Amino acid sequence: MQWLKSFQICKVLQGFSLSPTQLHRRLFSRVGAPRWNDHDSPEEFNFASDVLDYWAQMEEEGKRGPSPAFWWVNGQGDEIKWSFRKLRDLTCRTANVFEQICGLQQGDHLALILPRVPEWWLVTVGCMRTGIIFMPGTTQLKAKDILYRIQISRAKAIVTTASLVPEVESVASECPDLKTKLVVSDHSHEGWLDFCSLIKSASPDHTCIKSKMKDPMAIFFTSGTTGYPKMAKHNQGLAFRSYIPSCRKLLKLKTSDILWCMSDPGWILATVGCLIEPWTSGCTVFIHHLPQFDPKVIVEVLFKYPITQCLAAPGVYRMVLQQKTSNLRFPTLEHCTTGGESLLPEEYEQWKQRTGLSIHEVYGQSETGISSATLREMKIKRGSIGKAILPFDLQIIDEKGNILPPNTEGYIGIRIKPTRPLGLFMEYENSPESTSEVECGDFYNSGDRATIDEEGYIWFLGRGDDVINASGYRIGPVEVENALAEHPAVAESAVVSSPDKDRGEVVKAFIVLNPEFLSHDQEQLIKELQHHVKSVTAPYKYPRKVEFVSELPKTVTGKIKRKELRNKEFGQL
């Protein structure tokens, strides 16, 4: 590994003086490692050369098994298997395309909007090799979303799929910085470069840049639940963090593992869970190109392929449980992880009963990556997002950054002083005011409300501005939404605060009904739902107001925009 070779003696673990070889071995095997931060990390690091190329070398030396590094399938019978050596070749070609054909250089911004196709991985690592800052986005983006992202970031290039070419073309004239447009497509498009053709003719010889640990690597747009999406800029520490032995306990991946992470490529979880985490461990990334999630296909895939770990949104597990198949004992699956929201307690139990496996919950943001989790060896507390993952010192704080005692509601904070931890975003690009707003004393204030118990388990309540103060009671919307989700009439719901002349605020639920309940008497159904909530949770949490809607406002990443609903209630729209 390049940066290791430049150090004859590295003193990075307290009490140890390590040669490069010893350090590498300790990085990949030590379990009880102390905290790492910017002071004891290497000065230079690049995921492409120090991780992917390392495993390519291990393959050449016969020190890694025959399993592919990348295994991609779709529903039409197509299959791709790439070794780390093949990935090295293809990503070097990609880097040459960016530098020699597109004229891009270190520090330039590239918008990456692709579905789950192999080229997404090539572009991402190609950007790492060149120092180009990649900015992933979901293919659900519309023209106005793309315009906003390109303009605010001053992106010089975009790589996207054929279906989004018209969307980009409709706004390209308003993006003076956008010089290069590359498309992943089977057909040519006027004014666009054919990405696949270019990498076929490009040279596989490329010298990776020597990036500093603090050099920018990626920008992830926030979900926009509280306004326009902000640009959370991350440096190389986001990738290096996966080296930290304590961080490697998250999934405990081995080179023999096959990980299926179902995250949308536009989210930070895809960069971490579909690329950084598995390839740091030298294991296989498995991808099924699902344009839309089909629970039947998911079940079939888990039976057909030797997948050992699964990382998916709660809705995926919920949909699988709804399948009528009697057998969900997947032959090779060993570990399941979820995040984004909580499953109901009975859903956790059903999954355990039907698969024999527990579901471990993780929590994170665009700014943090995964910051807390229920690790494999930890006791599972249903509804908890687990404990903080090193190097994050996660505490519950008040508005001034004071640490609150256990079981006291506050904000999830991550300590940033005296040292900003690896993996935490650098800043909100082009928005120093927004960056300052989330710095709270010695902590980064996530804006998410939670409590922490005596054992260090964190209990998520919701966004800070989502918490409802009704008649002196503070109510987290997630609690009420989970209660409503247990009723068969409710397809999905969003709970917000609504003004009330007598109580100041009351709980209001916006509910999308399942089709079979659309013809029911609405007044009677409201009473039934209110009674149901009272029966399954504290009665003061029940929604005094209920409105049935056909759909809920959501961000492009699928998060409910409660702020929009709340503003409507208080007449701010």
From Swiss-Prot:
Transit peptide, start-end: 1-35
Subunit structure, interactors included: Monomer.
Name assigned to this protein: Acyl-coenzyme A synthetase ACSM1, mitochondrial
N6-succinyllysine PTM positions: K81, K142, K179, K200, K233, K324, K352, K387, K501, K534
Keyword tags: Acetylation, ATP-binding, Fatty acid metabolism, GTP-binding, Ligase, Lipid metabolism, Magnesium, Metal-binding, Mitochondrion, Nucleotide-binding, Transit peptide
Function: Catalyzes the activation of fatty acids by CoA to produce an acyl-CoA, the first step in fatty acid metabolism. Capable of activating medium-chain fatty acids (e.g. butyric (C4) to decanoic (C10) acids), and certain carboxylate-containing xenobiotics, e.g. benzoate. Also catalyzes the activation of lipoate to lipoyl-nucleoside monophosphate. Activates lipoate with GTP at a 1000-fold higher rate than with ATP and activates both (R)- and (S)-lipoate to the respective lipoyl-GMP, with a preference for (R)-lipoate.
Gene3D superfamilies linked to this entry: 3.30.300.30, N-terminal domain of ligase-like
Cofactor (UniProt): Mg(2+); Mn(2+)
Annotated ATP binding sites: T222, S223, G224, T225, T226, G227, Y228, P229, K230, D448, R463, K559
Similarity comment: Belongs to the ATP-dependent AMP-binding enzyme family.
Family matches, as SUPFAM superfamilies: Acetyl-CoA synthetase-like
Compartments where located: Mitochondrion matrix; Mitochondrion
N6-acetyllysine carried by residues: K142, K200, K210, K352, K387, K527, K534, K545
PROSITE patterns: AMP_BINDING
Single GO MF annotation: GTP binding
Taxonomic classification: Eukaryota, Metazoa, Chordata, Craniata, Vertebrata
One GO cellular component term noted in the UniProt record for this chain: mitochondrion
Pfam families: AMP-binding, AMP-binding_C
Tissue: Highly expressed in liver and kidney.
Species assigned in the record: Mus musculus
Gene Ontology BP annotations: fatty acid biosynthetic process
Catalytic reactions of this protein: a medium-chain fatty acid + ATP + CoA = a medium-chain fatty acyl-CoA + AMP + diphosphate; benzoate + ATP + CoA = benzoyl-CoA + AMP + diphosphate; (R)-lipoate + GTP + H(+) = (R)-lipoyl-GMP + diphosphate; octanoate + ATP + CoA = octanoyl-CoA + AMP + diphosphate
InterPro entries assigned to the protein according to its UniProt record, in alphabetical order: AMP-bd_C, AMP-bd_C_sf, AMP-binding_CS, AMP-dep_synth/lig_dom, ANL_N_sf, Mitochondrial_ACSM
Enzyme Commission numbers on file: 6.2.1.2, 6.2.1.25
